[in-house]
Amino acid sequence: MAIRRILTVDNAADLATLKKISTPVEAVTDELRALMDDMLETMYDAPGIGLAAVQVGEPVRVIVMDLAREGEDKAPRYFVNPEILASSEDLQGYEEGCLSVPEYYDEVERPSKVTLRYMNYQGETVVEEAEGLFAVCIQHEMDHLEGVLFIDHLSRLRRDRAMAKVKKARRAA
C-alpha cells in the first residue's frame, strides 16, 4: 500500500483531472484492489471519510469510505461503479468539506436518502439504501465521478470565496 498525492483545485492540472468524468471499471481485479488499498491509506492519512479515485489521479468509477467515528474500529467501505437507483424528494443540508478543496467547508443540500447499486471489494453486486451522513458522503463522492466538486453546488460568490480561501491557505503553508 502507498499514500498517493491528493489532487487539489488550486492546481490547474489537478483541477483539469478532477473535472474529468470517470470511466466504469470492467471487473474487480487484484490491480484494482491495490488501487483501493492505496486510496484507503491515503484517505486515512489525510485524514478524510471518503475519497474518489479521480482525486488521486485515477479517473475510474471507484470510491472508498470510512464513516467510523474517532475511537471506533475502522470500517472501510469500497464502491466500484456505484449508481443511484432512487433518491428521496426530501433534502437535507450538511456542511461538507473535501480533501481536494482543503480548508473550506460549506453547506450543500442533497436528497436525504438514496438507493444505490455498486460492486464491493470482492466484486459482488450490492444494492443498499443510504441515509444521513452515509447518503451525504456517497453523493459527494459520486459527484467526483462526474467531474463535479461540492463547491460547484454553491453560488458563484461562495465558490469564488472557496477558491480564494484555498489559495490563501496554500500560500500560508
From Swiss-Prot:
Q: How are cofactors bound according to the entry's free-text note?
A: Binds 1 Fe(2+) ion.
Family that this chain belongs to? Belongs to the polypeptide deformylase family.
Q: Which organism is it from?
A: Caulobacter vibrioides (strain NA1000 / CB15N)
Looking up Pfam families in the UniProt record yields:
Pep_deformylase (PF01327)
The positions annotated for binding Fe cation are: C98, H140, H144
State the EC number(s): 3.5.1.88
Name of the molecule in the record? Peptide deformylase
Per UniProt, the keywords (alphabetical) are: Hydrolase, Iron, Metal-binding, Protein biosynthesis
- Say what the protein does: Removes the formyl group from the N-terminal Met of newly synthesized proteins. Requires at least a dipeptide for an efficient rate of reaction. N-terminal L-methionine is a prerequisite for activity but the enzyme has broad specificity at other positions.
